[in-house]
Amino acid sequence: MSDRIRILLGRVCNKKMNKSVVVSIERLIKHSTYEKFIKRTTKLHVHDPNNETNVGDLVEVQECRPISKTKSWILTSIIKKSNF
């Protein structure tokens, strides 16, 4: 197991649960045949202990111990608030 802490940036896409949000992480991969860059999206369930985020916020998340069946990430900071 790696000792390095995994930190990712993403956008909040769902906030219908108590103390939990769904964060969408976008990354670029290169197609092996066509050599074109393609966007891929991963959705993570993130623990938000203070319920301080809204949909559309740009956030930083960090991997942690499993909090529930699907939550293994915790919110570390809000980088940019959304307009709505």
Curated annotation (Swiss-Prot):
Gene: rpsQ
Protein name per UniProt: Small ribosomal subunit protein uS17
UniProt cross-references to CDD domains, sorted A to Z: Ribosomal_uS17 (cd00364)
Organism from which the protein derives: Blochmanniella pennsylvanica (strain BPEN)
GO cellular component: cytosolic small ribosomal subunit
Annotated SUPFAM superfamilies: Nucleic acid-binding proteins
GO biological process: translation
Similarity section: Belongs to the universal ribosomal protein uS17 family.
Origin: domain of life: Bacteria
InterPro entries: NA-bd_OB-fold, Ribosomal_uS17, Ribosomal_uS17_bact/chlr, Ribosomal_uS17_CS
GO molecular function, one term: rRNA binding
Keywords of this entry: Ribonucleoprotein, Ribosomal protein, RNA-binding, rRNA-binding
Subunit structure, as described in the record: Part of the 30S ribosomal subunit.
Function: One of the primary rRNA binding proteins, it binds specifically to the 5'-end of 16S ribosomal RNA.
Record-linked NCBIfam families: PRK05610.1, uS17_bact
PROSITE patterns: RIBOSOMAL_S17 (PS00056)
